[in-house]
Structures are given as C-alpha cells and as structure tokens.
Amino acid sequence: GRLLGGVGAGRAPATVHPGAVYLHQGETYVVDSLDLESAIAFVHAEDPGYSTHAREVTDIEITGTGEHTDLGSVTLGVVPVAVTNTVTGYLRRTLSGEILDFVELTLPPQHLPTVAVMYTITPEALSANGIDPLRIPGSLHAAEHAAIGLLPLVASCDRGDIGGLSMAIGPGGLPTVFVYDGHPGGAGFADRGYRQATTWLGATLEAISACECRTGCPSCVQSPKCGNGNDPLDKPGAIAVLRTVLAALEVGRPLDGRSPA
C-alpha cells in the first residue's frame, strides 16, 4: 500500500468512514476500514457512481464562564466548550442528487475541548422580527453556516478550521448559535469573532443579502460539510437573525473599535 493523503483526526469519522467515497487528486476511492486508534484508513480505487454524505449528531456543553456582553434581548460571548460529535451513518447519492439509501454506522463519539463564540436571542426578539417558533431552527442554522464562511474575514483561518452548532433551545434555554475552533484548546479564531463581531456578522449579513438565490445556496447559507444535510435552512430568517444581533450591537458595547451609530 501507499499513503494517499491525510485528514484531520476530528473529521476522520465524517470523511473516511467505512464505505465513504474519498476523492484525492482527481481520483476516486472507496474506504474499506477506519482504525481511529492507529489513525489510518484503508481504501481501494473505485468509482462507484455515487457520492457519500455523512450524517452527524453534535452536542456542545459550556464548560466555563468565559466572557459575555449583555445587549438586552441579545447576549454575545466567548466561552470554553466541550463539543461531542458522533457520525451515525451516511447517505449515498447518485451524481444527479437522487438519494439511494442511508447506511447506518456505529462509530465512537469524538470529543473536542475548545473555545466558541456564541450569541443568544430571546424568542420575543425573534418573534418581533418576523420569526415564529417553527422558523427558529432553520433561521439559526442558516445564520450559523454563513457566519462560519465569513469568520476568516477577521481571523486567520479557513472554513475547515472551525465548526458550528445552532440550537432552538440552547444551554441557557434560549435560541443560541455557536461557532467554535476546530482545534483542541482553541486557536484564537472564536475570540477574534467575539472581538470583531460587528465587522464579522455585518459582512455575513451583507453576503447573504447580496446573494440572488431565493432559498439558500452554497454561496450563502449552505455548507459542504453540514452533518444535517443542510436541513432545515431559512435564508430570510437568517437575515432577520443577523439584523437583530447587529441592531443590538449597534446600541451596545462596540466590540471591534466601531462607535455605536
């Protein structure tokens, strides 16, 4: 055998699980086995005519106090967290996008102690901005995806260095969005997002609003590594979420050198 390439340990269960279709330098391979203890996956060359898409369950727990800014109906914070991620299986899709089937997997959970930038919004504030309870999950999810894509604007990272999770009912009982560093102990990316929240989330809002699609696309709110298959996503709701947060930031403590308007 020969070494083809490498993937991050934390992403291995989602990208090189048994049965996964793995692309490397234009060639297609299928994964035969994954040994997490030895950190090695065995593959064979094959083009099966379908793609695979891992399904994951992610949980997050705040493990320390961190730093918070209370903006009334919105709170912003940067906190230590413990992220637990479990790959439960994968979808097989034809090249035209048709779902063939779902294959269950039994893989151990992956644990990541790291740092996250987070914000919460009261349900009342969301309702006042046109987001009823049924739309909260998709609105937060879409805002989270877009924010992950724009964090490299203020932090020296790329999309693969960070992860996220949105919750209609977060650890504090409120709708919550987390964006976390994908490195054990954190790498400073989330902290930069917290310090420059107005710039970061403002650019995120602009990017979504400028995209001409109606319901969301890979250029705005869809994510190529979403463990939930980009469902649910509510693009108009994401715009309302970000406007709500930015309006609170505008009258609260400026976090990135900007004066309140």
Where are these regions (language model features)?
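Extended Lys/Arg-rich polyanion-binding regions
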Residues: 1-211, 230-245, 255-257, 261
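Local cysteine-cluster metal-coordination motifs and their immediate loop/turn environment
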Residues: 214-225
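Alpha-helical transmembrane segments and their immediate juxtamembrane flanks
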Residues: 250-252
